[in-house]
A protein has these predicted regions:
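Fe-S-dependent hydro-lyases/dehydratases of central metabolism
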Residues: 1-812
Length: 812
């Protein structure tokens, strides 16, 4: 234990912790650093050797943005779409290499309950493996399907905020820190838990105790002050703040929210803002710990959270707004205007008072007219506040005798029956029912028949009002315009039945105005206070039981999982080798393709329906499936046999070697045939030849490169030579053990390459951005050219020399 250790007595026990106040006494300049940096400071001090502490403290004092610090997660949270193939690979490696392979950090793997229940074959394969994995890997906890609160499980149930461990027979407390690949890791920042959303390879590394090295971050302080005016909802906060963050530019920075206005934002709404910050490229959107945080923990977990409060008070991180930031954004809740978005003007947020001025057509039909509301969809919000607010609008409307025109088709779209349940417990949902809103999981989006006929006959521009974020999509072929707004305003405009009025000033009906039916924040808070632990207890009491399908699955007691040959949805990837690469020796590798500039991940990994007469289609037919059982590519990429057959099979892909033919075709010069990439790779494998791709500039652009590089590796590609790479894609190639090389002065054209050349690369000198001479030879000539290694850091070099991240971690 280091010199900053301290202790406190609580509940008949002594707890030890790394005392930041001791640090501040010795280094007062650190006292006012942001709360998010205090979390990082504590973690770096706790995980440092004594001789490293001074260096760490100096980095924090000087805000050395060009220096690096550690990010040490205490827990990793995974969804099943990433976690399942990852643990399949672990299981395969354990079996083939006969090694003990378990995560070193606690893993929570959450199975998405929203997976279609009409997919028994897929579910059977996936769930049987996950259930086996939960019993055969240490430090792995699987949350099985059967929980409608999938996006919120970490926020509402799993997170503990504090961790404890035994060290020298002492209980040591420290803040929980999380990494993951989806929204579970970003939402948690609302709870005062630092959570980073990482790419798949970095998350994989974190599971095995590999410390994430990050650049010392800048922190943008977003001061929220003032109060929301009546008639506004949290949707308006989201839309206005979204524009602020977008204009300011927060990419690569931590966003930390603070100020008096934060106290009036519920924790669920804070979670929405945390996610919003990451949408604009921020490292995270962090909220410090305050009374709302502690109240939320006690409400959702049914525990006494006093020790959490005590810890953060002692660390100077409780309700502490007197801090210094690198940059500032001031956000005045009082100045917010209520806005709506029109599907015809996606880039423009329109103040609701200005909606009438945006309308251009005023034709009339027999039953309807232009700008009439004919479809109203109240999509349940992630925000409990917004749902209650909408119901209270309905309640007041009913009490005043208001009703909605029969021409308006009405739906209340819920993503969880628990939303319906808590609104029933609050005795609120009956008012939506009284106004004619049909409760559905997904809106069928039908129109009243006479309106449908009228709209077609008179070519009317009728509208839909919705609180669904997918408002820009076509809701109904007869509805030309969709207006996106808060759930409460959807109900208000439904009551009026037309968009051609200023809802802020004009009456909705006779002498009844928006202000008469819109609840105050006090009224909303009164209902919020009625939601207690019993609701969450009911949601989570059987969280690990799973649904009936899960419970019926029988798991083999064998410590090795049997990947049945009949499985068509899951197959492990045999692409990991535990071997060090001290030298490169590639002899007469075959060239698979010459590819254009700007090849992106969409070109590499196809999406959509699998059709017959393709490599994947033929494989599935061999497995006994009929074309109507093929499914879509995205659902079968957990099967290695599918991915390696699918990679590059974009019909518009251009391999210059077979030009003008398009698609994933290669030329077998030896047999004078044009064959598929997959067939070419199989022939190369049979003749024990490596494969090379030669490409133009910006190879691998766009997102989601994990599947792309995995597929390229599975296809047997060892080297990609390009004019330039997308930086993150290049990084991922290295992390899976593929060598990225860049041309220096020449390219395919200047070298006059034909594609029949074989490529030889030999060296014992593998170094950062070094140069290497390669040989290109065919029956008529031999050419030499220099290319450059694209290793930009020691970690990249280490990963490559160990054949990729996973192989590197296994070797350690």
């Amino acid at each position: 234990m280091n010199k900053f250790i301290n202790s406190f007595y609580f509940g008949n026990k002594t707890y030890y912790y790394h005392d930041l106040k001791k640090v501040f006494e010795k280094y007062p300049l650190l006292r006012k650093i942001p709360n998010s940096l205090k979390i990082l400071l504590e973690s770096n001090i706790r995980n440092a050797n004594e001789n490293e502490i001074e260096t760490i403290i100096n980095i924090f004092i000087q805000k050395s943005y060009f220096k690096q610090i550690r990010y040490v997660p205490t827990r990793v949270i995974l969804n099943d779409s990433f976690g399942l193939p990852l643990f399949m690979d672990f299981a395969y490696i354990r079996d083939r290499q006969n090694i003990e392979l378990n995560p070193k950090v606690m893993i929570d793997l959450i199975v998405d309950n929203r997976l279609a229940i009409d997919e028994p074959k897929r579910n059977q394969e996936r769930y049987s493996f996950l259930k086996w994995a939960s019993k055969n890997f240490t430090n792995l906890s699987v949350v099985p399907p059967n929980n409608e609160r999938y996006p919120y499980i970490n926020l509402e149930y799993l997170s503990t905020m504090l961790c404890s461990s035994m060290k020298e027979d002492k209980i040591v407390l420290y803040p929980e820190t999380i990494v993951g690949t989806d929204s579970h890791s970003s939402l948690i920042n609302a709870l005062g838990v630092l959570g980073l959303r990482l790419d798949e390879f970095d998350t994989q590394a974190s599971m095995f105790g590999s410390i994430k090295i990050i650049d010392f971050p800048k922190v943008v302080g977003v001061e929220i002050f003032g109060t929301l005016s009546q008639g506004l909802s949290f949707n308006d906060v989201i839309e206005n703040l979204s524009n602020k963050l977008k204009e300011f530019g927060v990419k690569g920075k931590i966003v930390e929210f603070y100020g008096n206005g934060v106290k009036n934002i519920t924790l669920e709404n804070r979670a929405t803002l945390s996610t919003l910050a990451q949408e604009y490229g921020a490292i995270c959107g962090y909220f410090g710990v305050d009374n709302e945080t502690i109240s939320y923990i006690e409400q959702t977990r049914g525990v006494d959270a006093s020790i959490i409060k005590e810890y953060f008070i002692k660390q100077g991180m409780y309700e502490n707004d007197d801090l210094l930031y690198d940059e500032y954004i001031r956000f005045n809740l009082t100045a917010i205007k209520s806005v709506a978005y029109c599907s015809r003007k996606l880039s423009e947020d329109i103040e609701i008072k200005d909606i009438p001025s945006k309308l251009k057509s005023f034709k009339k039909g027999t039953f309807a007219k232009d700008n009439d509301v004919v479809l109203a969809i109240v999509a349940s919000s992630k925000s409990t506040t917004s749902n209650i607010q909408a119901c209270l609008v309905a309640k007041k409307a009913c009490s005043l005798g208001l009703s909605i025109n029969k021409n308006v088709k009405r739906y209340f779209e819920i993503d969880s029956y628990k939303i319906k349940e808590y609104l029933e417990k609050l005795d609120l949902i009956k008012y939506l029912d009284e106004l004619g809103f049909e409760i559905v999981l997904k809106s069928p989006n039908k129109l009243i028949e006479r309106v449908n006929i009228d709209t077609e006959r008179f070519n009317l521009n009728v509208v839909a009002v919705t609180s669904s974020r997918n408002f820009e999509e076509e809701i109904h072929p007869r509805v030309k315009t969709n207006w996106y707004m808060s759930p409460a305003l959807v109900i208000a405009y439904s009551l009026k039945g037309n968009m051609n009025f200023d809802i802020t000033k004009e009456a909705i009906y006779q002498d009844i105005y928006l202000s008469d039916i819109f609840p105050s924040s006090g009224e909303v808070n009164e209902y919020l206070s009625k939601i207690n632990y019993s609701l969450y207890e009911d949601i989570y009491k059987n969280i690990y039981h799973g649904n009936e399908f899960w419970q019926d699955i029988k798991v083999d007691e064998n410590t090795n999982f049997d990947f049945d040959e009949t499985f068509t949805y899951i197959r492990p990837f045999n692409i990991y080798e535990k071997r060090a690469i001290e030298s490169i020796e590639i002899n007469e590798a075959k060239i698979l393709a010459f590819l254009d500039n700007d090849i992106n991940t969409n070109n590499i990994v196809p999406k959509g329906k699998i059709v017959p007469y393709t490599q994947v289609g033929s494989y599935l037919e061999e497995k006994g499936l009929k074309p109507d059982q093929f499914d879509i590519y995205e659902k079968r990429y957990e099967n290695s046999e599918v991915l390696k057959r699918a990679v590059f099979t974009n019909t518009k892909l251009k391999n210059k070697i077979v030009s003008p033919k398009e698609g994933a075709y290669a030329r077998d010069f030896q047999n004078r045939e044009i064959i598929s990439f997959f067939e070419f790779s199989q022939r190369a494998k049979a003749s024990r030849k490596d494969l090379v791709i030669i490409a133009g500039s910006n190879f691998g652009s766009k997102e989601n490169s994990f599947l792309a590089v995995k597929g390229i590796k599975a296809l047997g590609i060892r080297v990609i030579i390009a004019k330039s790479f997308d930086k993150s894609f290049k990084n991922d190639l290295i992390k899976i053990g593929i060598l990225p090389l860049e041309f220096i002065d020449e390219d395919i054209e200047s070298l006059d390459l034909k594609g029949d050349e074989v490529v030889t690369i030999k060296t014992e000198d593998i170094k950062l951005n070094g140069k290497i001479e390669i040989e290109l030879k065919n029956d008529f000539f031999t050419k030499y050219t220099f290319v450059q290694y694209r290793f930009d850091s020691n970690s990249e070099l280490n990963y490559y020399k160990n054949n990729g991240v996973l192989s590197y971690l296994i070797s350690k």
